[in-house]
């Protein structure tokens, strides 16, 4: 067994102003697979997330729905937590940023940064809506991105190219609230002095924390020099008030990443023998891994590590960056309803199936992943049902009928068995590097090999009463069970539902350290029951109908 690591893993926080869709779920599945594997090999790992619970969109939606922002945030928090649990996302703590702990951390960090002269104030030009007499924060303005010219972008950052810019730089601005053209008015804001961290950040991003493709993107932001970061917003705003400032609030992108600290502290307070300093102390030997989408890499690779460095806390060990999920080749959009909600999917399909389909496409690169319902159905039925589960069904039918559930005394084809077990280190590396699609490729090759073996041996021809044939039948069927057993050990972090049913069926836990130990007599398996069902066209049609997808 390797040296036991201490690891903290986080996902970027879902925003508490709407239901989750399958695009959101990708990141949580990706991280959960990585976490489950690390638990499986014996690492001490904690997995946390929270709802991002502040900001203008929440304030606006709550007002529109005639509900308080606090109540709306809590309702979505409960919904998100429930959806994620049904996808078997195994968080040790799922919290929200609108919490006492997070406000305490925000005030403390602000105080520390200010003491180090890393916070300064200055008057800025800001959009102001004369029709409703209020300053307009970033999410209340839409216009054309000044970097890539994409239309309908918010005035703080672009969802298309990822650029972060001054709100008044947006082209052809329009107020979302009144649909009028805003004027520019002066307002005092507070800034975090990001340029002071340029030397540190250049070194940090080259420390192995980012993949080369992400590194190239982040490096571009240094070309024109880093700019101070506006960490304040004018009232009205739903968030935390800034101490000793009138009508000023912490910008959501300041308090949201601080939520990584407060959510973990909340876990430490609830559980014994988990110590905050063991993970966040600057000299800690623990490791911190963060799973994020490519659209928030700017905040996680520049602002957040700079703040951690400014307050002398540990920086992330690695950022795993993923792409977006497209639907039939098109970008999903909440505004026009072109999404598959998490709860709609769960109503009709096993959560394992989405975990599997995404796993076929997850790699360490930040490429977009396309979701096609027809391809989803075909791949799940072909690979999980026909190739993997069917292997268990075919093998167990003979074990149950002729041998009362007992497996044979020996492995029928030891060379083939070793082909299955010899992939252990390769698959270990793929899990650790987050190249899950490579694992699926290897596993499907194994499943095909197992079924070819079974077909070639034709055990159904060996059911006669002769002792030699019965022994051979026993060994071949037990070989099929052992190949299925190894496949399912490899798949355990990916398919928790199927793994639990497999453990019940095989009468043994699926443990990484047992891969090289075959199941032999007197091991007894239980009578086979269907482990999962095929996806039908009617299920797909129901999802399409409820998601208004053609």
UniProtKB/Swiss-Prot annotation:
Subcellular location, in the record's words? Answer: Cytoplasm
How, per the record, is the cofactor bound? Answer: Binds 1 zinc ion per subunit.
Please name the top-level EC class of this enzyme: ligase
Q: GO molecular function terms here?
A: ATP binding; metal ion binding; methionine-tRNA ligase activity
Pfam families per record: tRNA-synt_1g
Q: Where is this motif: 'KMSKS' region?
A: 331-335
Keywords for the protein's UniProt record, in alphabetical order: Aminoacyl-tRNA synthetase, ATP-binding, Cytoplasm, Ligase, Metal-binding, Nucleotide-binding, Protein biosynthesis, Zinc
GO BP term, example: methionyl-tRNA aminoacylation
Which residues does the record give as Zn(2+) binding sites? Answer: 145, 148, 158, 161
Short sequence motif named 'HIGH' region, residue ranges: 14-24
Report the domain of life of the source organism. Answer: Bacteria
Q: Which family does the entry's similarity section mention?
A: Belongs to the class-I aminoacyl-tRNA synthetase family. MetG type 1 subfamily.
Described by its record, this protein's role is as follows:
Is required not only for elongation of protein synthesis but also for the initiation of all mRNA translation through initiator tRNA(fMet) aminoacylation.
Q: What is this protein called?
A: Methionine--tRNA ligase
Organism of provenance: Wigglesworthia glossinidia brevipalpis
Q: What is the lineage of its organism?
A: Bacteria, Pseudomonadati, Pseudomonadota, Gammaproteobacteria, Enterobacterales
